[in-house]
Structures are given as C-alpha cells and as structure tokens.
C-alpha cells in the first residue's frame, strides 16, 4: 500500500463504474460484489491521502524550518520513501501543503539566483481568488438544492465533500501562484508555474531564442502554454528534440514554451545575459 499511487485507486473505481455499465446482466454476477462495495475505493483513496499527510507533516516542517525550501524538502522526503513512484505523491503533498498547511509564504525559499513572479500578471492571482470565493458562496446553495432533490440526503454531503476536495487544489494553486517563482539557477531555467503544471528544469543551452509574444497563442502539438488567468508575454523557442515532463505524460516533445510573467522584459534580459558568456565560449 505504501508504494501504491493514489491515482491507481481512482482508476480502479472508474474501471468498476465502466464495467458495471458495459457488462451484460447475464454475465454480471462477479460484478455484484464490487458494486455492493463501491464505496470501498474512494474510502481507500481518502485513507491513503490522510496517511500521506500525517506521515509528512512533521518531517517536512522540520526540513522547511532548516532550509526554507519546501519544494526541496518535499521532493527529498518523498523520493527517499517512494523512489520512481514519488511523482504522484509529490503532487498530492504539494496540494495539501499549499492548500492547508502553508502559513507564511514570505518565509519560503526557492532554489535559484534570480526569481520572477507571475501572480500580478493581468490580475492572475486575484482572478483565482475571486473564482474560489464564488465557489464558496455557491456551496451552501448547491447543498440545499441537492438535499431537496436527491433521493438520499447523503448524496448532498458526498457532493459537498467532492467540491471541498476540488477547492483544496484551487486554493493550493492560488497560493502556489502567489509564492512559487520562475527562477534562473546558474545555467538552468526552473519553470515553476503554480502547482497544477509540472515543474521543468531546462538548460539555458537548450533555449534557442527568448522574446516577447502576444496573448493569442492557440493550443497545438509541441507547444506548452503557462498562462493560468493572466496573459502570455514571453516565448521560448527550444532546440529540436527537447522533451519535457507533464503531469499525465512522462515525457513529450516540446519546441516552444509560452508563459506570462510580471516582468517579461527583466526575464528576457536576464536569460540573454546568462546565455551570452556560454555562447562566447562556444
């Protein structure tokens, strides 16, 4: 159980739901046991989440007090425990830390020589906060409506639980937007953009050009857009063959990255300044 990603349990629950819909009634006897105990899967997933939180809280807080770098603390602790299976656990741990346990974001420290924020870009963080506020206002109204219309009262409470769980990720994304920067660390660009997008460590040597761009960038293959509720204003062109990680895809080819920053001109100048000595040496 310690090495079983939480998403595996969610996939199992979804598989049971799919099976209950497509298996013919005549051949459905083996499914009766699963259908009668369908709540077991989300219960197991909730238990795994609680175990992850309780296991990490004390250890990570101690590491953060020592270094101030919560990303490094979470990554080192989870990699030591789960090895190659650490990625989904790291995503969940960040959600709980930024969504629930973060108290003083200004005290956080991040790897890098120069840091660039993106929370003020076109009211990025403010728009996220407004959306969360609207969902909180809607929660009691939705509960009342479901309580009156649902066949059983527990369904309204179950919907509340799912909505609160979704709000956890939205709050975590908002707080990560406020405090997690895009950074330059030596000859590496560290792309941290909220917590719902996978972090990237890109060698500056792999960046062919860095320039201003407009906000009208369409979704297409090989293009990564990091915008949230802001506007795109920086374009990075990468060397051919560059592959980056994603939340759901381990590696995918990416030739261009568009992102929105509070200080695009300062970022472009800093990247070019760091690239210049290396290109002169070549």
Predicted regions and their residues:
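Juxtamembrane/interfacial segments around transmembrane helices
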Residues: 59-68, 91-103, 178-190, 208-218, ...
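Membrane-interface module
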Residues: 5-14, 31, 61-64, 83, ...
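Non-transmembrane, membrane-adjacent beta-strand/coil modules in membrane-associated proteins
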Residues: 193-260
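N-terminal membrane-targeting/pre-transmembrane regions
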Residues: 56-151
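Conserved beta-hairpin
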Residues: 165-210
